[in-house]
Amino acid sequence: SSDVCSSDLNYVGIEMYDSVLLRALQKREKLETEGIHLDNLKFMCMDARLLPEVFDKGEVERIYLNFSDPWPKARHAKRRLTSREFLARYNEILAPEGRVEFKTDNRDLFEFSLEEVEAAGWKLMAHTFDLHHEDAMMEGNVMTEYEEKFSSMGNPICKLVACR
C-alpha cells in the first residue's frame, strides 16, 4: 500500500507457512518491477509463538492481525492469535503505547477475541461488527485481499483495536 511506501516506519510481515509468504514476496517483487520500492518492509517465516525471542521488549508499536486462522475446534483455542496466551506474548514486545488491531470475517472468532482481550486485562479501544459501515473506524483502513474478497461476498468485517 502507499502507506508503506511513504512511511518512515518499518513493517515486518510474519507468516508461519512458506507458501503464503512466497505469494507476498512475489507481490513485492512485482511492485518493485513497477518502480514501487518497499525497503521498509521485511518478511519472516516463523511461528508467532516465538515473537518474544525475536523482538525486544517495547520494540513493536503495532501488531496487525488480518484474517488469521480461526482454529475453530475448542481444543485449538490457544493457537488463535487473539488468545490470552498470544496477548501475553504481544505484551512482552509492545511499546507502552502499543496496540493490537485485529480484522476478521469470522464472527465466532471475533466474539472469542473480545472475551480474550477482557480476560487478559487489556483495554478495548474500539470495535465493530461491521467495519465497512463505520466511518470512524474505516479512516486509514488498509484493505487486504481477504477483506476485499469477503466484503464483496457480503460478509461483514469485524475489527477491534486493543491496548494494555
Describe the function of each predicted region:
Residues 1-6:
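Short, small-residue-biased leader/transition segments that mark boundaries at the very start
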Residues 113-164:
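Class I S-adenosyl-L-methionine
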Residues 25-62:
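S-adenosyl-L-methionine
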Residues 49, 54, 60-81:
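A short SAM/SAH-binding and catalytic strip from SAM-dependent methyltransferases
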Residues 80-99:
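A short glycine-rich, Lys/Arg-flanked "PGG" loop and its adjoining helix->strand segment in the class I
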Residues 9-14:
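Short beta-strand element of Class I
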Residues 17-18:
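Conserved SAM/SAH-binding beta-strand->alpha-helix loop
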